[in-house]
């Protein structure tokens, strides 16, 4: 019979030790034994709470931005998948909350940003929230590392080459390799995007498809035949002082 006092002591000791480990080390620890796996599988445990409070900006934890990732562990994961300050146009900066990009008001420029982590395997979904005016062109989608992040003029940069795929929210057009691939979604009088709406981007690296959801409604497959390359969440914008947030959600739920 297990002494409950001893069990509690072991739990508290593990909690303290795990709180001081790096996140990569926690991943390895979860594979040591079933006990440690179940301990770390509690996504709202004090261990994940401690790491969350110490790594995430307080501004993001106090906002509604992370409402779709309710546990401490999923908030941490979203933070490490957010926009990359090192992989964006020179006219873009990432705000202190870590999840929102701001495009500076630079004339005759189109500017883009990619997420920190790209995907080549599995199924992934993330939310994009355009929190400022769209302007004449506002594109969300994916790109490889080879796709350009800045160009002259006000154009649909994302989707302008063979390394990027995008949905222009202003005109409801799909874009790839510089061509308009058709209207999207395939609805009569499809409603235009409203600032502040959350769009879910669904990347399936097994079926090589990209799809979108809006207001929890699946809009259909937008692109098929995606290449076997690492693909990154990406947006491109033209409007000065507009802001776009991205929150990684993990594996999409079917149904």
From Swiss-Prot:
SUPFAM superfamilies from the UniProt entry: Concanavalin A-like lectins/glucanases, F-box domain
UniProt pathway: Protein modification; protein ubiquitination
BP terms from Gene Ontology: negative regulation of gene expression; negative regulation of synaptic assembly at neuromuscular junction; neuromuscular synaptic transmission; positive regulation of protein catabolic process; proteasome-mediated ubiquitin-dependent protein catabolic process; protein ubiquitination; synapse assembly involved in innervation
UniProt xrefs under CDD domains: F-box_FBXO45, SPRY_Fbox
Keywords: Neurogenesis, Synapse, Ubl conjugation pathway
Residues in B30.2/SPRY domain copies: 61-253
Superkingdom in the source lineage: Eukaryota
Cell compartments where the protein resides: Synapse
SMART domains according to UniProt: SPRY
InterPro entries in the cross-refs: B30.2/SPRY (IPR001870), B30.2/SPRY_sf (IPR043136), ConA-like_dom_sf (IPR013320), F-box-like_dom_sf (IPR036047), F-box_dom (IPR001810), FBXO45-Fsn/SPSB_families (IPR050672), SPRY_dom (IPR003877), SPRY_FBXO45 (IPR035784)
An example Gene Ontology CC term for this record: neuromuscular junction
Ranges for domain F-box: 3-51
Pfam entry (one): F-box-like
Complexes and interactors: Component of an E3 ubiquitin ligase complex composed of hiw and Fsn.
Task of the protein: Required in the presynaptic motoneuron to down-regulate the levels of wnd and restrain synaptic terminal growth at the neuromuscular junction (NMJ).
Recorded family membership: Belongs to the FBXO45/Fsn family.
UniProt protein name: F-box/SPRY domain-containing protein 1
Organism per entry: Drosophila sechellia
Gene name linked to the record: Fsn
């Amino acid at each position: 019979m297990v002494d409950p006092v001893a069990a509690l002591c072991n739990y508290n000791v593990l909690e303290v030790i795990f709180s001081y480990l790096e996140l990569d080390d926690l991943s390895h620890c979860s594979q040591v034994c079933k006990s440690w796996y179940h301990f770390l599988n509690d996504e709202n445990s004090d261990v994940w709470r401690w790491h969350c409070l110490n790594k995430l900006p307080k501004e993001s934890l106090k906002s509604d931005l992370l409402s779709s990732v309710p546990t401490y562990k999923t908030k941490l994961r979203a933070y490490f998948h957010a926009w990359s300050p090192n992989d964006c146009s020179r006219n873009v900066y990432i705000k202190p909350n870590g999840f929102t990009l701001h495009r500076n008001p630079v004339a005759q420029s189109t500017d883009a940003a990619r997420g920190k982590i790209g995907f080549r395997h599995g199924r992934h979904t993330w939310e994009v929230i355009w929190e400022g005016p769209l302007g004449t062109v506002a594109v969300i989608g994916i790109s490889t590392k080879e796709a350009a992040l800045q160009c002259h003029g006000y154009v649909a940069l994302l989707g302008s080459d063979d390394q990027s795929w995008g949905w222009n929210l202003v005109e409801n057009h799909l874009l790839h390799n510089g061509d308009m691939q058709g209207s999207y979604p395939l609805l009569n009088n499809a409603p235009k995007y409203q600032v502040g709406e959350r769009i879910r981007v669904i990347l399936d690296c097994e079926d090589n498809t990209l799809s979108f959801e809006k207001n929890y409604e699946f809009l259909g497959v937008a692109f098929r035949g995606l290449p076997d390359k690492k693909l990154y969440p990406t947006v491109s914008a033209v409007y000065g002082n507009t802001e776009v947030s991205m929150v990684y959600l993990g594996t999409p739920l079917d149904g």
